A protein has these predicted regions:
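A membrane-periplasm/extracellular boundary helix in multi-pass inner-membrane enzymes
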Residues: 199, 223-268, 283-291
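Long extracytoplasmic/lumenal interhelical loops at the membrane interface
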Residues: 146, 268-283, 287, 291, ...
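Hydrophobic transmembrane alpha-helices and their immediate junctions
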Residues: 312, 333-374
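Alpha-helical transmembrane segments of multi-pass inner-membrane proteins
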Residues: 25, 116-147, 155-222, 246, ...
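Perimembrane helix-loop-helix junctions
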Residues: 52, 56, 210-234
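Aromatic-anchored transmembrane helix interface
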Residues: 67-79, 88-111, 123-132, 154-166
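Transmembrane signal-anchor hairpin modules in multi-pass inner-membrane enzymes, especially those
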Residues: 1-90, 111-122, 126, 174-181, ...
């Protein structure tokens, strides 16, 4: 049975059970319905406020926790300041609400600490594997019957690619479990995550796969397998061959599209393609930042300020809601300071993991942090990074989860029998 149904005894059992349910389903749902992730995060924040005000538990944040929480909070504070500096103000409440996930660590980390060390992270990793398997099957049905690029439940192919990459990678960390069921879910979950990446046609996510492989080599070199390397090699090879066969059409289609876009750029015939549109947005963003590097334009004026820097004949052909680069987006929103605080926030999971005492918990936290940061930085340099209803809660929740356990924690299997 799954340990989610059997929290420890004592006064913290109800909170522990609720924590387990929240963490487990948060890991399952991103590719199926990201709105539920936002709901889980918001509900956890409200519960945290209630429990702190009624003294059911204390804030209980270490010096390292506070450093991470402050690093997370500076980014939204700078963005809110930029919103107030730059009119119009009609969207101020909406933007403040959208930035709330980045403050959540102050509330959900003390709540997570009501569960025993080593309980929540294994639940999340198992949930990620299960979620990726279900999401992949959903994506496969879309490709077979409906869509050119799979979206699963995300309504955005690029978002599915990022989620598949990150949560598939997280799922594979469970291959070291002593339980064969968890090992199978880990391998299938990783393969399913890669399948989602391929079926979504998210080219920026393809770039992250080699980086993740290096992270896995570092992590698994330090920790023994309960699965024989021969079995792992055979299973992995078969799954890899199956994924390539399944996704070859999508891979070739996306490569051909990129080649066509590059050929159009060389011809300089004025045709606006996906690639030329992004390059135009980058140029417009750099030009806009150079004109107001101190305060930026505020997120409410983001695209208007970029489009104002582009020729009149190109503007109507760029129906994008973001610049396709997270760092340039932060620079437009709040100037050079915006880029700096974004970079700081991206470092917070690594800071939280690195500052733990040595042990299995620290190694796992570092692996999670590296998977998280590399996924966001690389894909976010070519597409979506933050200010997105799914990616913001995922980042905030994972940062809290990374900080939750001590570095010396030993993790037990979730499946007990």
């Amino acid at each position: 049975m799954i340990a989610i149904l059997h929290p420890g005894n004592g006064t913290g059992s109800t909170l522990d059970r609720n924590n387990g349910i929240a963490v487990f389903f948060f890991a399952i749902l991103p590719g199926l319905s990201p709105n539920f992730n936002s709901f889980i995060l918001l509900a956890s924040m409200v519960s945290g406020i209630y429990c702190l005000t009624t003294a059911r538990f204390s804030l209980n944040l270490s010096k390292s926790d506070r450093l991470v929480a402050i690093g997370m909070s500076i980014y939204p504070l700078v963005m809110i300041a930029s919103i107030f500096i730059n009119p119009p103000y009609s969207e101020v409440p909406d933007w403040i609400f959208r930035l709330l996930p980045f403050f959540s660590i102050w509330l959900i980390l003390p709540r997570m600490r009501q569960s025993p060390d080593g309980r929540l992270v294994p639940l999340f990793i198992l949930g990620a594997g299960i979620g990726m398997i279900i999401t992949f099957l959903f994506s496969l049905l879309q490709i077979m019957f409906l869509m050119e690029r799979a979206e699963a439940g995300t309504s955005n192919a690029a978002l599915l690619g990022i989620i598949g990459l990150l949560f598939g990678g997280i799922a594979l960390l469970n291959v070291q479990s002593p339980r064969s069921v968890e090992q199978r879910i880990a391998i299938l979950g990783y393969a399913a995550g890669l399948g989602c990446v391929l079926l979504s046609g998210t080219r920026s996510a393809w770039l992250v796969i080699p980086v993740h492989i290096v992270i896995f080599l570092w992590y698994f070199r330090k920790h023994s397998f309960h699965l024989s390397l021969r079995s792992l090699a055979i299973t992995g090879s078969l799954l890899f061959a199956g994924l390539i066969a399944l996704g070859s059409g999508q891979i070739l289609h996306r490569i051909e599209a990129l080649q066509a876009n590059m050929a159009s750029l060389e011809r300089s015939d004025g045709e606006v393609t996906s690639l030329s549109a992004r390059l135009a947005l980058y140029k417009g963003a750099v030009s806009a930042i150079s004109k107001d590097p101190l305060t930026g334009y505020g997120p409410q004026n983001r695209m208007a300020s970029v489009l104002a820097e582009l020729p009149d004949n190109i503007r109507p052909q760029l129906p994008y809601s973001h610049v396709h680069n997270g760092f340039l987006t932060a620079g437009i929103d709040a100037g050079v300071l915006g880029i700096a605080v974004l970079s700081l926030m991206l470092l917070t999971p690594l800071i939280g993991a690195w500052r733990k005492e040595p042990g299995p918990g620290r190694d796992l936290a570092i692996a999670l942090a590296l998977l998280l940061v590399s996924s966001y930085v690389i894909t976010g340099s070519f597409g979506i990074m933050f200010n997105q209803k799914a990616l913001d809660p995922i980042f905030a929740y994972l940062v809290a989860l990374i900080c939750a356990d001590r570095g010396s924690t030993n993790f037990a299997p979730v499946v007990r029998c």
